Design a protein with these regions (language model features):
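Short, glycine-/aromatic-enriched active-site segment of Class I SAM-dependent methyltransferases
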Residues: 120-139
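Short alpha-helix
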Residues: 141-156
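Class I SAM-dependent methyltransferase SAM/SAH-binding core
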Residues: 19, 25-76
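A short acidic, Gly/Pro-enriched loop at the edge of an enzyme's catalytic core
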Residues: 75-86
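Conserved alpha-helix/loop element of class I SAM-dependent methyltransferases that forms part
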Residues: 1-14
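A short glycine-rich, Lys/Arg-flanked "PGG" loop and its adjoining helix->strand segment in the class I
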Residues: 100-114
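A short SAM/SAH-binding and catalytic strip from SAM-dependent methyltransferases
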Residues: 86-99
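Conserved Class I S-adenosyl-L-methionine
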Residues: 163-227
Length: 227
C-alpha cells in the first residue's frame, strides 16, 4: 500500500521508464508494475539469488514482458544515461548514503525525472538510550526527516513529498516474513553456530521493533533535481 501511495505522489505524467535499485526479491517492483501498468521497469540487485527470485516473481505475475531483473551495482546501474523517468529504492539507499546515492543516480534521470526512496528516521527528538545505541551501532547515519531533507538538498535535489510508514507496514512486509525465515532457519540448521548467530541477531532486531516502534520508522521521500 505504501508503494502505491508513494507512486501517487510522483509529479507529472505517469513514468514510462523506471529503475528499481536494490530490488531484493522484487515484491515492491511487482507493486510498482501494478501501479504503473504502462511502465517498463528494470530491477537491479547485486545478489544473484535476489535477481533470480525477482525474475521468478515477475514470470509468475505475468509481467516479465516489461519488467526485468538484472544483476548490477546500484551506484552505477546498467542503464543508459538520462533515460529514466523514475528511480525507485526501498530499504537500500543506506548502502550508499542519501546524498551520495542521489549524486550517483542523477546522470541516469531524464531532466524531469524523480527519485523515490525510503530511509529510517527518528520519530522523536530524544529516543531512549537503549534503542539509540542499537541504531547508532547498526546505522550511525540515522537522523530525522528534517535531516534526510538536508541530505537531499546537499545533493542539489528538493523534496517534493514525504511520509512515514506505519508500524503495520514494517510488520507485514519485513518483520513478519523475517520471523518465519528465522523459524525455518533454526529448524533446518539447529546446530549451525553461524545460522544461530544470524537468527539471534534477527530476533533481537524484532524485539527492538516491538518495544520501540514509536521511536523510529522508515519514511518515503519523493525528490527531484533542483535544476
Amino acid at each position: 500500500a505504501h508503494t502505491v501511495r508513494a507512486v501517487s505522489l510522483v509529479p507529472g505524467e505517469a513514468p514510462a521508464a523506471v529503475l528499481d535499485l536494490g530490488c531484493g526479491p522484487g515484491a515492491q517492483t511487482a507493486a510498482l508494475a501494478s501501479a504503473l501498468p504502462e511502465a517498463r521497469i528494470v530491477a537491479v540487485d547485486v545478489l544473484p539469488a535476489m535477481v533470480e527470485e525477482a525474475g521468478r516473481r515477475f514470470i509468475e505475475r505475468g509481467i516479465d514482458d516489461r519488467v526485468v531483473a538484472v544483476m548490477g551495482d546500484m551506484a552505477a546501474p546498467p542503464v543508459t544515461p538520462a533515460s529514466q523517468d523514475l528511480i525507485w529504492s526501498e530499504g537500500a539507499i543506506y548502502n550508499l548514503g542519501v546524498t551520495e546515492a542521489l549524486r550517483a543516480w542523477r546522470p541516469f534521470l531524464k531532466s524531469t525525472g524523480t527519485v523515490a526512496f525510503t530511509e529510517p528516521v527518528w520519530l522523536m527528538d530524544s529516543p531512549p538510550t537503549e534503542i539509540l545505541d542499537w541504531w547508532l551501532a547498526e546505522y550511525p547515519a540515522i537522523t530525522d526527516s528534517a535531516g534526510v531533507r538536508a541530505q537531499v538538498e546537499a545533493a542539489s535535489f528538493r523534496t517534493v513529498a514525504s511520509f512515514a510508514l506505519p508500524a503495520s507496514a514494517w510488520w507485514e512486509e519485513y518483520y513478519g516474513p523475517m520471523e518465519q525465515r528465522i523459524a525455518a532457519l533454526r529448524t533446518r540448521l539447529p546446530d549451525d553456530p553461524v545460522a544461530s548467530e544470524v537468527a539471534t541477531a534477527a530476533e533481537a532486531e524484532i524485539d527492538y521493533f516491538l518495544r520501540f516502534s514509536d521511536c523510529y520508522s522508515y519514511a518515503f521521500f519523493i525528490v527531484q533535481p533542483i535544476d
